[in-house]
Amino acid sequence: MVRMSADELDAFLHRAFPQMDENRYRVEEVHERFARVRMAFDARHLRPGGTISGPSLMALADTAMYVAILAMIGEVPLAVTTNLSINFMRKPQAADVIADARVLKLGKRLAVGDVSLFSDGDPEMVAHATLTYSIPQRR
């Protein structure tokens, strides 16, 4: 069951993490165990060679998984990443990047998922990440 809509999650991220405005993220959609987050193209995300940098892709993957988890559990700001592993598969274009996050397992204390990243308009994956999140005990 989805507990937060894309608009609610987008508003929460921009309220709780003001730096999201700088990264130009937007929550586009959420469904059960799924979220799509877009990082709008900005020259600040480029590395030498004119490609989106690895740290920018990692931050987007982390944010997309956070969104997918919060969509399922509600507003739990203290859920934190405990592991992130990413494979860079091909050079991303200098364009918006789309992150599709899937929650594979959602437990009481841990969530595990993966994120596929794509340059906007290109069906070939540019990176794939697996993540584990710690979910704090509700009081």
Residue ranges and their predicted role:
Residues 1-38, 44:
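Non-catalytic linker/capping segments at the edges of enzyme domains
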Residues 3-4, 91-94, 98, 104-139:
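HotDog/MaoC-like acyl-thioester-processing domains
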Residues 23, 33-35, 54, 76-84, ...:
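A generic structural signal for short beta-strands and their flanking turns/coil linkers
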Residues 39-41, 88, 135:
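Hydrophobic residues in beta-strands and at strand termini
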Residues 40-64:
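Hot-dog-fold acyl-thioester-processing enzymes
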Residues 67-98, 103:
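Hydrophobic beta-strand-centered segment that forms part of the acyl-chain substrate-binding groove
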